Amino acid sequence: MNSKTVVLGTARTPFGRLGGALSAIPATSLGAAALAGAIDRSGVDPAEIEHVILGQVLQAGVGQAPARQASFKAGLAKTTTSETVNKVCASGLLAVVSAARMINDGSNAVVAAGGMESMSGAPYLLKEARTGYRFGDGKLVDAMIADGLWDYYFEMTMASQGAKVARELGITREEQDAYAYQSHQRAVAAYASGEMKEEVLPLHVASKLKGKFVVEKAPQAARARIPALAGGSSGSSMWDHTPAEEFAPNPDAWSPFVTGDVPHVLFERDEAIREDSSLEAMAKLKPIDKDGTITAANAPGVNDGAAALVLADEAWARSNGHTALATILDHATVGWDSPYIALTPAMAAHKLLEKNNLSLSDISVWEINEAFSAVVLTTAKLLGVDSAKMNLNGGAVAMGHPIGASGARIVGTVIHQLRKRGGGYGIAAICSGGGQGDAVLVKVG
């Protein structure tokens, strides 16, 4: 079969800072909130979601089958299958692409996909403790750096790699700071105009209940949660079996949502956006690497958040009365020497254009993940596209980069940008650790 895949709904959480508003929320609960929001916005009955694919990079200590956890917490049925994918920063985008492939080949009609990350929740590892210490000190390993931000092959940070490419292409510190300033200003303007309401799902974060969201009216998916996983069998067949009380899940693990009169705060905007950013303040910051050009200002922060989309077979969507937001047309992936990771979004986008016989002028919207300002400036330079035409609402430098979620976030952003501008083709592209790049082609109208 060769079905077409359409997107029926998208949602993402606001992104939190390291140790910030979402730091007590497990990644799987963030994923559940995004899933529930996307499903609610799509109008699809939660019971019709056949499969869930979620990207997550920092899985140490999260627990078995993270996507399955998020699926259950979002209220989806035990018959809804799931899988977790890890392609570093491209994880969420790969989840969306994998869902489209399953739909295109006829394996599934409706799949929810996206990504989630709690970088605040990444643990420290004591690797030698398994076999015991004879004597002496032990070494703690930061799982966030080791599993997410460190090139295993060349033993260098992602920031060092971005700075290397910027230096070789002649991209200056001043250009990178100017781009970062633009990202913040665009993000501030997008929220002020109300444009982000279609994209961001506000959260009522319980201020005194660790790891919970307050819902005044539970999202549709949460309301559809299997009503009673305790209390014995509902039938004589094994297939009708409901676990007995002693095997019932912990309610706190089952749903991230709570109701009632609970103290909470409304979290509705990305926490890292700076209205007061200035080029003068940025210029005072020291680079991350000696003699480098990447700083805390022209790189994204360490963030928490999730994003999700509901994808479906076009014919199924039409026959069930659903309106498609966009069509997922194609995907391209490339690999290169990992120190040159900043080249890969341009390489993937170029490959995607060639595959589909499209030119640069055919693309109405570009969303390039701001792994660093240098990555977007590199992409613009290699493709020959004005960087001012990319990331029109700002990007990860301002909004944040929860690494497992960003790939899904930029696909959703491209869709909403295209709809705002009357349709056309859009490309979302992202680099990922190990020297890989991915790009997705979407169409509205």
Regions found by a protein language model. Give the residues of each.
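N-terminal extracellular/periplasmic Venus flytrap/periplasmic-binding protein-like
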Residues: 12, 24, 32, 175-230, ...
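Flexible glycine-/small-residue-enriched beta->alpha junction loops
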Residues: 110-164
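Conserved catalytic cysteine-centered active-site region
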Residues: 25, 56-110, 139, 152-158, ...
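Beta-strand segments within the central parallel beta-sheet cores of soluble alpha/beta enzyme folds
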Residues: 47-55, 82-86, 111-116, 177-182, ...
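Active-site pocket-lining segment
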Residues: 160-164, 196-201, 209, 237, ...
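Condensing-enzyme catalytic core mediating Claisen C-C bond formation in acyl metabolism
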Residues: 1-25, 167, 277-342, 347, ...
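Active-site-proximal alpha-helical scaffold in enzymes
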Residues: 85-117, 160, 166-195, 308-315, ...
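Conserved active-site "lid/cap" helical segment
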Residues: 1-62, 66-74, 81, 161-173, ...
